[in-house]
Amino acid sequence: MTSHYVIAIFALMSSCLATAGPEPGALCELSPVSASHPVQALMESFTVLSGCASRGTTGLPQEVHVLNLRTAGQGPGQLQREVTLHLNPISSVHIHHKSVVFLLNSPHPLVWHLKTERLATGVSRLFLVSEGSVVQFSSANFSLTAETEERNFPHGNEHLLNWARKEYGAVTSFTELKIARNIYIKVGEDQVFPPKCNIGKNFLSLNYLAEYLQPKAAEGCVMSSQPQNEEVHIIELITPNSNPYSAFQVDITIDIRPSQEDLEVVKNLILILKCKKSVNWVIKSFDVKGSLKIIAPNSIGFGKESERSMTMTKSIRDDIPSTQGNLVKWALDNGYSPITSYTMAPVANRFHLRLENNAEEMGDEEVHTIPPELRILLDPGALPALQNPPIRGGEGQNGGLPFPFPDISRRVWNEEGEDGLPRPKDPVIPSIQLFPGLREPEEVQGSVDIALSVKCDNEKMIVAVEKDSFQASGYSGMDVTLLDPTCKAKMNGTHFVLESPLNGCGTRPRWSALDGVVYYNSIVIQVPALGDSSGWPDGYEDLESGDNGFPGDMDEGDASLFTRPEIVVFNCSLQQVRNPSSFQEQPHGNITFNMELYNTDLFLVPSQGVFSVPENGHVYVEVSVTKAEQELGFAIQTCFISPYSNPDRMSHYTIIENICPKDESVKFYSPKRVHFPIPQADMDKKRFSFVFKPVFNTSLLFLQCELTLCTKMEKHPQKLPKCVPPDEACTSLDASIIWAMMQNKKTFTKPLAVIHHEAESKEKGPSMKEPNPISPPIFHGLDTLTVMGIAFAAFVIGALLTGALWYIYSHTGETAGRQQVPTSPPASENSSAAHSIGSTQSTPCSSSSTA
């Protein structure tokens, strides 16, 4: 009997131990994270100290770009020794062909790692560096025509600028910045630049930026220290910034890489992300293969195709709790175990997850993680000449292509933008972007350097590609098409020739700021698939349509899923297209829209370049349309502020929506309508202002405004909607009118540089004893027509006054000649008067008055 009780008690104790075992939450004590913690929290920003840009080198044989680096304030043992310099052309230049001179001045010797995109090979480039510094080139072809020389540069910005001008005649750009790991410079000359480079303190330009990552304090714990083939990481973010308007969505980047460079890690990851604020998690993985599942209550996005080395899926769960204990319990209850780490950050906008490699299990992991049909694609030795270079610019060992392999459709739509229109750059070798989902510039390798020429007229666009450039890039047996795969290339002895009508083969039009049309299409280089393509990645049923390169509308047997197409975007511009039938966005002839920003409500001088606005400061906006038809009008359909330059990505910070003001600070002004005495010059203006609220955790924002045509008549032959005033639009605008407005819209984008109050107080703090600088005078003036009217009236008044005086004087002289004896004034007064008149008047009547 006793033995039965002992057995029962022993079984009860065993069951208690078994149930208590998997609860590791009690074993995890939060502590400040160290460098060994797998997850690090950071705050990312972009800035420069001062600088300038000019078009002064346009007529010279080379561009001249000056970088003047300042110490970042580290101790002697923490000096940064390496800088990565990213070079690519400005947005208006597709491939940069001009010679360039770089003056790279640094306070101590540096190793400059050069990363280039869309810079033509065979062009002379000279790098002048400080004594002891060296330049390392990522491309052997680029280094063949590049030279490096050491120089003893002068100190100080102005001295260095004058030295460069004396040596080379002019300077294209001058940038002063603190030493950063990544510096992004766009080469090229833009005619909108000023003629001379004058250094300014508040120099803000997307062409010249440095990236700074500041570590942020975080707490966490590691619950499983041994590397596993499957890991679960929990990240909890309290707030993405300290801004009181943090209800607006902010991008939070999760960067996943191996803990050591030159290694490729195979993992199955589960990330549980939690933030009470409205954020968008942007997931990017490099050099890590396997599957990745993201679970979060917020929106989730993935990086570009080159930033997704893993098979990514996402799951939106609204029941994810907060705090460490609840999160760990929720993960275990939902079967996500074993939990590897938990991290909590009070403030951050970027997280780095670094993974260890369990080398002893790596061989088996590949078998279980990747379907057998695709294993051959991960073997670098089995690949043809078309390979994707390593993401890290060539120093990595991962010669194989990242998994999974995107198809043509996904790559095109991912890199073109949500509207299907290509961004004004080459997606294969992207330019620097600080925009939607890509708030920071990102390096992308694997560019295709081909020689092409584009011609277009009012009916078609023709692009010719040299065959030799394909062979030089290692391509053979490829299929060359436009975006529409039915539009195949024709071959002659030397070129591939592709022809597209302006409204076919995937060609998309977009109106440029110069009232012309830019037509976009892409060359798709498709290499035949390797082996069988019947297999699908594990867990494909969980993928959303279009996620990670598997579009929902493609058949399983499509061989393009298992080849890596290269996409080369090209465009062709037509100025003042006269055939409105080929492009229906501008059916009303000679119409010009414009938008300008001003600093005051006088609307005198528009702001040039990036508009600087302080927190809670006023922004004054003027939009106008110049047209020939007086019955045509326009309306401000939508205005919003966004961290994205792409106007098709909407934002919660709306100023005007469907003509109706949504922000309580919007104030409209009543400018006079301008009528010019020449045809096609009738201008309507609309002016408004609003108070800028700091709702985003970034210093660079974009004001997006959509203008739409309307008619002042009851009915318009081209079915334009009737113009509606803002107060009426807030109550009586129906869906049919909104749809009609969307068919004739023009979008303008203006960059805004946010000036934070904290930065202003820090700058003003040390100079309290100095007298306040005299603020620049504000000249209150009138518009041109009013001034012309006043001048004309003054001229008429002056002419009438002169005639009246002449009449009085001439008649007074004749009377004096007829009078023989003066009666009233004495003789002394008459002689004085006659002398005065004779001395001041030189007219023919002067002699008669004294006769």
From Swiss-Prot:
Disulfide bonds join 52-197, 639-705, 660-730, 710-723. GO terms for molecular function: activin binding; BMP binding; coreceptor activity; fibroblast growth factor binding; glycosaminoglycan binding; heparin binding; PDZ domain binding; SMAD binding. SMART domains: ZP. The modification Phosphothreonine is found at residue 840. It is found in: Cell membrane; Secreted; Secreted, Extracellular space, Extracellular matrix. Glycans are attached at residues 141, 492, 534, 545, 571, 590, 697. Residues 1-20 form the signal peptide. Residues 816-851 are annotated as: Disordered. Its main location: membrane. One of its GO terms (cellular component) is inhibin-betaglycan-ActRII complex. Extensively modified by glycosaminoglycan groups (GAG). Residues 455-730 form the ZP domain. Residues 810-851 are cytoplasmic. InterPro entries: ZP-C, ZP-C_dom, ZP-N, ZP_chr, ZP_dom, ZP_dom_CS. The keyword Zinc does not apply. Residues 836-851 have a biased composition (Low complexity). GO terms for biological process: animal organ regeneration; BMP signaling pathway; cardiac epithelial to mesenchymal transition; cardiac muscle cell proliferation; cell migration; definitive erythrocyte differentiation; definitive hemopoiesis; epicardium-derived cardiac fibroblast cell development. Residues 737-751 are annotated as: Interaction with TGF-beta ligand. Keywords: Cell membrane, Disulfide bond, Extracellular matrix, Glycoprotein, Membrane, Phosphoprotein, Proteoglycan, Receptor, Secreted, Signal, Transmembrane, Transmembrane helix. Residues 21-787 are extracellular. Residues 817-834 have a biased composition (Polar residues). The chain crosses the membrane at residues 788-809. Forms homodimers and homooligomers. Interacts with DYNLT4. Interacts with integrin ITGA5:ITGB1; this interaction promotes the internalization and trafficking of ITGA5:ITGB1 into endocytic vesicles. Interacts with TGFB1, BMP2, BMP5, BMP7 or GDF5 and inhibin A via the ligand binding domains. Interacts with ALK3/BMPR1A; this interaction results in the cell surface retention of BMPR1A. Interacts with ALK6/BMPR1B; this interaction enhances BMPR1B-mediated stimulation of the BMP signaling pathway. Cell surface receptor that regulates diverse cellular processes including cell proliferation, differentiation, migration, and apoptosis. Initiates BMP, inhibin, and TGF-beta signaling pathways by interacting with different ligands including TGFB1, BMP2, BMP5, BMP7 or GDF5. Alternatively, acts as a cell surface coreceptor for BMP ligands, serving to enhance ligand binding by differentially regulating BMPR1A/ALK3 and BMPR1B/ALK6 receptor trafficking. Promotes epithelial cell adhesion, focal adhesion formation and integrin signaling during epithelial cell spreading on fibronectin. (Microbial infection) May act as a receptor for human cytomegalovirus in different cell types by interacting with HCMV trimer composed of GO, GH and GL. PANTHER family: ENDOGLIN/TGF-BETA RECEPTOR TYPE III, TRANSFORMING GROWTH FACTOR BETA RECEPTOR TYPE 3. This is Transforming growth factor beta receptor type 3. It comes from Homo sapiens. The gene is TGFBR3.
